[in-house]
Amino acid sequence: MSTILVTGAAKGLGKAIYNALEADNHEVIGYDRNFGHDILKPEIACDKLDVLINCAGVNLIDWLENFTEEKWDEVMDVNAKGIFKMTQAYLPLLVESKGTVLNIVSNAAHMPMTCSLAYNASKGAAHIMTLQLARELTKKHGITVFGIAPNKLKGTGMSDAIDDQVVKTRGWTKEYAQQYQLNGLLCGEETPPERVAEFIAFLLQDKDHHKHLTGCILPYGA
């Protein structure tokens, strides 16, 4: 049994990951602003840690001319700076356990999307941060660092917010916006967060399942 901390655990993919890991009898710590936590001002919530999962995320959509600096900062803070702050804060515990850092990235890291400058930039940052952290932490400390990059997820708060924001910014109907996005997915449907969570739970059953993934970003859905 491992001690695993999941950020963004109150809903969406983070909650699905929390539930899947708890079902595998891990000791799981949910870390979320809805629980009174702040990933930009981390407080140590445990005395041992085997796995840190950086899953907290936010997306704000708008045209460049309308996008405020405040919105930019919010997206970059949660999606990129939060990874830096949480990993740095929990590094001593991860060094002690020779643990694992798993970052939830996105296919948006390498796929430009209209009205999504901040989100794409933040996920691009999270992508290269994952590779850089692996370079710095694996050989020096024995810490495995890798990422999972899902496509659009089904039924999450972020996905619903994306649909609503696309309607407002593009002037489309909600039905057209949803179909437009589905047309871009090879299997023609959004990925249920539970499937991603089950895959992560399998990888984290034993470090031998994932230690050779250090420095890798695994796509989930296309």
Sequence positions of predicted segments:
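C-terminal helical subdomain
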Residues: 147, 170-222
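Active-site helix of classical SDR
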Residues: 87, 122
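Active-site-adjacent segment of SDR/Rossmann-fold oxidoreductases
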Residues: 111, 132-143
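Active-site loop-to-helix junction immediately N-terminal to the catalytic Tyr of the SDR YXXXK motif
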Residues: 67, 112-120, 132
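Residue(s) in the substrate-gating loop at a strand-loop-helix junction
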Residues: 106
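Substrate-binding pocket helix/loop in short-chain dehydrogenase/reductase
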Residues: 63-64, 71-74, 163, 181
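Conserved NAD(P)H cofactor-binding loop of Rossmann-fold oxidoreductase domains
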Residues: 55-60
